């Protein structure tokens, strides 16, 4: 599809995104040039400059702008900068305030041998104490010097302490020196020590429930506020079109709220965003203080790059912006996430992008010590990890929705109903986010939502055929800017358009309205009458500038949306070409049958392959039948135990093969598994044999898996395990010798697992023989190196990790251990000295001295089989789902209480009979919901459930069931009919009313969802029919036998859903799971449910019996 792109529109490809950034950089340079050219700040008109950003600008001005941003030659006053030649520490540049801050004098030309003064060419180590000089020597040759930051140094002349923050640039090593103040937290050095300050904040972020990016953003601004103490902390997100929005905020109560504000892309220039990617935390202590000039060696060919410096001075344009906001100091942290659509030249794999910023403002000067800033930076890395997961999950949900909608739309086409994609539900509006959609086919229009008139759609189609005749469609966020001549007639209701050509003259259209309706001025009311100085760079002015920029423009079409439209277009073009072919349907069904036969062959092949995989798996796998006798014994478990497959077959696992101490555990696990309850992380001890004689023991951690027959009955148990014999023996010996670990760590025993350790500053202190063998790095080569940064890292390290996310996760594990928290098994993947991929599970534990003080961390590795890793992933996923479900259940109880209170109040008012009946129906629906919230799904599936028996009228049940289906039926245009005798409604019965309601409501919903006819002249319908017979028991009780027939129009539910209903499926859809549970509930109430045909129509047939609430002698049966 062709695509028209403008400022503030979504790129349809990587190239358009890259081009948009280049264009935005030009707009930034234009704004910068306008500011520089103004003789005084009052002559700078901000809002006019934003508009003027659309005009062209020379490449020389853009280059000058970028040069000024990165090589401005100015630094802030809260520290001093010294740049040196790395090998010799010869000074190449320094800030004009450095001599005073270091308490040394300057000397233009040093005398022979005298370098105790600061000047170009001096050895910077002569200005520092001997210990400080040694600390600087330590970093020479280290690839990632940031892991050593901050290094604590002292001035030789005065003893004044400083944090030295190091980075490299194009000329050498840059040292930012920040004075350590008396009230600063005591941090002696290294990133690991700084990260401890964020331990509580990190724990909170990791404990948050998934699926709520808003809560995540709210939490991170609260934690940063607590760490830094700034008056205002905001989370600022960049949208696809480069403009920004404040999505979370915490502030001092007397400050104006900025939550919900949108800002033009020029407010945070592209050059500044690039700098944030390189230097992820930026502090401005006092925007009113003049910057300090940088003095540099005249032999340097250009001004020195300050991209990575913590002291780089802000541009005057930005300081004025801050002053206008009454923000004297600021702290800004970059939030960087993965970017699968990274389009930068030379990027072939997944890149990274700037998702947004966490911005702190203060109304007075404020300094935040570097260790706290480092902790904040680490917190941002954890925040980015969480964001990656949330964005990924949201994308998956969205893609699944699109695929499901596409499938349903294609299903309509297979049933020869092409017009159904606009006349039925779901329809084409459900495919992507839009305000309206239309099908233009055969010179007729079908309209959905907010659209142009039929005449206007015909005109748009003609314009496309005339002006874009060579393309298969068009997408734009502004019809006016695309050149459509009648765009002004459409108004704000229709601004954006995505069009897909499906035949030579026919189109599908999706429409979007004006962006401004999506933009809200949050917090304080934005009064249109309130006028501020539009020429000043103030948030309100910025907001007005944004509204002007997005005039006659919609939200951009995202790449995933255009992919979905294009996919549907390809399907429809083929379908519409074949629409008159009478053999099309026959051909389709024949192809489907071929696919089914092919699927059976593939299933057989997969089954054979699974058997082979189990036999050759690197994990020990064994299986038993219903009597606990071995019927599966793979090669790995035979190797570990010394017992061959033939010898093990038929032996009793509990009585003959496990060690005596594991016998009770195995018997219990077998009993539970045969009852259908699977266990995880069970430790069992198997006997080992040497030529069939018992020799020793092998320790396995196993997960059990029930083996079932075609009827879903448990017929055996499979054990998938991991050999932890070596690790277990090591841990036991650690306990026995109470800390005398050297004999174990440095042992050559092959049973000892790989072990490495670090001191409290993050330097490697242990690297045992097994770790040498695993990594191919000798102990003496790694001891004393920084564990993360020199040994494990991304570039020029001993053991390369896969991406920044893995580095961050490893740092989290080590940080938890140093803070005394035991870590779970962390899947660690790295590449050894020879480039071989190593997969292992890491357990990190604190290391303490004799007084119990934490002195470092110990890490145990054991190589993990794919089977165990998969089991661990599945377990964590299940735990996460269970946690989220518990949260939802708990949160639903509160609004339920509110509904109950409202109902109670209404019951005490003067109501008509009909109104009272509605209140009663509401009460029973509420009771049903409470029952569902209290359900334990596992208990229901296993047949354990307490029924709440009480008297009820069948009429109340019918009313409650129909009320639950009315909204869905009206939305889908389905008519609900009933055939229920009046005497049935008046029957007073004894049973569980809420459960009966739940079952019938689920079946009714399913019937409504599938009540679709292919004949447009027929109305879709669902019929509820109830019949009964009566039996008298010996004790005078009458038993009523009921048949509920819920029939519906259409071809019926799918075979897959029928399989889910009868528990024959291995995977459940939400609808299938609900129906399956309802069938289980009916059987637990001694009833039955079938899906059958009644008088030519598909229907659910429910048979169940209830006693009448009164005997013949009028005595209650309760």
From Swiss-Prot:
Comp. bias regions, Low complexity: 1-10
Outline the extent of the GAF domain: 212-391
A Gene Ontology annotation in the biological process aspect, one of them, is: red, far-red light phototransduction
Provide the family line: Belongs to the phytochrome family.
What is the name listed in the Swiss-Prot or TrEMBL entry for this protein?
Phytochrome 1
Boundaries of every Histidine kinase domain copy: 887-1110
The PAS domain covers 606-677, 740-811
**Which GO molecular function terms does the record list?**
photoreceptor activity; protein homodimerization activity
User: Known post-translational modifications?
Assistant: Contains one covalently linked phytochromobilin chromophore.
Instruction: Kindly give the InterPro entries that the UniProt entry links to this protein.
Output: GAF (IPR003018), GAF-like_dom_sf (IPR029016), HATPase_C_sf (IPR036890), His_kinase_dom (IPR005467), PAS (IPR000014), PAS-like_dom_sf (IPR035965), PAS_2 (IPR013654), PAS_fold (IPR013767)
Disordered: region residues: 1-23
Question: Which Pfam families is this protein grouped with?
Answer: GAF (PF01590), HATPase_c (PF02518), PAS (PF00989), PAS_2 (PF08446), PHY (PF00360)
Q: How does it assemble?
A: Homodimer.
Q: What does this protein do?
A: Regulatory photoreceptor which exists in two forms that are reversibly interconvertible by light: the Pr form that absorbs maximally in the red region of the spectrum and the Pfr form that absorbs maximally in the far-red region. Photoconversion of Pr to Pfr induces an array of morphogenic responses, whereas reconversion of Pfr to Pr cancels the induction of those responses. Pfr controls the expression of a number of nuclear genes including those encoding the small subunit of ribulose-bisphosphate carboxylase, chlorophyll A/B binding protein, protochlorophyllide reductase, rRNA, etc.
Query: What keywords are assigned to this protein?
Result: Chromophore, Photoreceptor protein, Receptor, Repeat, Sensory transduction, Transcription, Transcription regulation
Q: Which domain of life is it from?
A: Eukaryota
What SMART domains does the database record attribute to this sequence? GAF, HATPase_c, PAS
Q: Which positions bind phytochromobilin?
A: 317
* SUPFAM superfamilies hit by this protein: ATPase domain of HSP90 chaperone/DNA topoisomerase II/histidine kinase, GAF domain-like, PYP-like sensor domain (PAS domain)
